[in-house]
Design a protein with these regions (language model features):
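Acidic/His- and Gly-rich active-site-bordering loop/insert found
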Residues: 29-136, 155-164, 342
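Solvent-exposed, acidic/flexible segments
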Residues: 31-39, 50-61, 85, 138-141, ...
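Bacterial N-terminal signal peptides
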Residues: 9-23
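Acidic/histidine-rich catalytic neighborhood of metal-dependent amide-processing enzymes
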Residues: 132-133, 139-217
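N-terminal secretory signal peptides that target proteins for export/translocation
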Residues: 1-7
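Solvent-exposed loop/turn segments at secondary-structure junctions
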Residues: 51-53, 85, 96-99, 109-113, ...
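Metal-dependent amide/peptide-bond hydrolase catalytic core
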Residues: 29, 204-465, 471, 477-481
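Sec-exported extracytoplasmic/periplasmic mature domains
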Residues: 43-50, 65-74, 150-157, 187-194, ...
Length: 481
């Protein structure tokens, strides 16, 4: 899941009154053979530990590879590889007629850590209970991986011939670690994954309120993730002889300045359309404020009022926040070292290095050193100049297909292009010039988002509706009915 992403909730408050629909149907339109296949793939993936600490993405990749070989895919259309033997990625090319450029589907196989003592069930056992599937990865994102595998196998079994190649990449280390699979493939095997555009089931999806579909979100852009290490060093000394030059005080002062700093207000094409749409659904002062921020000259007072909502604030601004702190080495000694981590979510169009330089200006203290920390935990004096590109125009073919499917499966729920305030593997494909969209048919209650958390779970019928959705979507985008 996009790092730090909050599934749903961004549009829910305004839509509840206007777009409530009948509860979800009891069963998705998926035959029993497909249900069994999807169940078995999902169970197999959940029960393969793919955490960074002790797990193996390679084991999951090989399990998928074997299923695809058994379904009749040629080994010549597969690639298994990566930077080390635990982090091998799998790429499959489902060959079409070549009438159109390929579509790339990406799904990460790794999951965040989970401790057995924190859960009521074993996080690495696939448990069915009370209408839910439990297990680490049921929401993030082995559900999406299982759906992609199921879709590929069923299409192959039916002899389906798409009008374009369908490329699917199952990858490592979206959640962290040193070997991000999408980044590695872009840098080392771009020819295997080059496509017109990218669909990432790790974003988007249907927001539910008490079983009723509120909206179908499509992640049309996202923020850039960046960690920065703040360091202050000092000779230290005995605590009975304090001096003003204290490493902790310098660091604390810098963090207080960050606390009171607001990055500039910015809207892009996606967020402008989002807030403009939202203004027609809200009422009173909130509606007026939403209209005011989408004008050619946005109203500063309206921006300030709307920024009190953390989700809207994050969509309007780059945000940086202190997330970790450590200092000192003894209770009776002046600190020789004070460190903090500042986590930033950066609006499209700005680079990691640009924000590092901005932090230096905010802190305004030469004793505070600001370094960039990559996903592997490695620290660098300078950050990459990589930036999340401004969102391209929405793909009309894709949006039309999603609109039609949503109208049929969740009548009345609007399709809402959004900006994810987190970051996913789409950041790498977007940067490589392949427009990337978070698209999912999974429906989750807005108050039951458990990705990365305790007792992660997914409603059983939501999973099978997701299977149904992607099977139909792939056909619609590749020449099928």
């Amino acid at each position: 899941m996009p790092k730090g992403a909050f599934r749903g909730g961004l549009f829910v408050g305004a839509l509840l009154g206007a777009f409530l629909t009948p509860p979800l149907a009891t069963h998705a339109q998926v035959d029993e053979q497909t249900r069994k296949l999807a169940h078995d793939v999902f169970q197999q993936l959940i029960e393969i530990n793919t955490t960074d600490s002790v797990g193996s993405v390679t084991a999951a990749s090989k399990a998928i590879q074997q299923r695809l070989l058994d379904a009749g895919f040629s080994p010549n259309d597969m690639y298994l590889g990566g930077p080390n033997d635990r982090k091998e990625n799998l790429v499959l090319r489902y060959r079409g007629t070549g009438q159109k450029k390929p579509i790339l589907f990406i799904g990460h196989l790794d999951v965040v850590e989970a401790r057995r003592e924190d859960w009521t069930t074993d996080p690495f056992k696939f448990v069915e209970k009370d209408g839910y599937y439990y297990g680490r990865g049921t929401q993030d994102m082995k559900d999406g991986d299982a759906i992609l595998v199921t879709t590929l196998i069923r299409l192959k079994q039916e002899g389906y011939k798409p009008d374009r190649d369908l490329i699917v990449a199952f990858t490592a280390d979206e959640e962290g670690g040193k070997s991000n699979g999408v980044d590695w493939l872009v840098k080392n095997h771009r020819e295997l994954i080059d496509a017109e555009y990218v669909l990432n089931p790790d974003g988007g999806g249907v927001d539910l309120d008490r079983g009723k579909a509120v909206s179908m979100d499509v992640d049309a852009t996202e923020k850039l993730y960046g960690d920065y290490q703040l360091t202050v060093t000092n000779p230290g000394g005995h605590s009975s002889l304090p001096v003003p030059d204290n490493a902790i005080y310098h660091l604390a002062g810098a963090l207080v300045r960050l606390q009171h700093f607001q990055f500039p207000f910015e809207l892009n094409a996606v967020t402008h359309a989002y807030f403009e749409r939202l203004s027609t659904l809200e009422t009173g002062q909130k509606s007026a404020d939403l209209k005011a921020i989408t004008q050619p000259t946005p109203d500063p007072a309206a921006i300030e009022r709307l920024s009190q909502n953390p989700e809207w604030n994050s969509m309007m601004h780059t945000t940086c926040v202190a997330t970790r702190l450590q200092a000192g080495h003894a209770n009776n000694a002046l600190p020789q070292l004070a460190e903090a981590n500042v986590n930033c979510r950066i609006l499209p169009g700005h680079s990691l290095e640009e924000i590092r330089q901005q932090l230096i200006k905010i802190f305004d203290d030469p004793k505070v050193t600001v370094r960039y920390v990559n996903d592997a935990g490695e620290v660098f004096d300078k950050a990459p100049d990589r930036k999340q590109l401004p969102p391209p125009p929405l793909n009309p073919e894709l949006m039309s297909a999603i609109e039609k499917l949503t109208a049929a499966m969740w009548p009345g729920a609007p399709v809402i292009p959004t900006m994810s305030t987190g970051a996913s593997d789409s950041v790498y494909t977007n940067a490589a010039g392949m427009p990337s969209y978070g698209v999912s048919g999974i429906a989750i209650e807005t108050n039951d988002v458990r990705a990365h958390g305790q007792d992660e779970r997914l409603p059983i019928e939501s999973f099978y509706r997701g299977v149904d959705f992607y099977s139909k979507l792939v056909r619609m985008l590749s020449g099928g009915a």
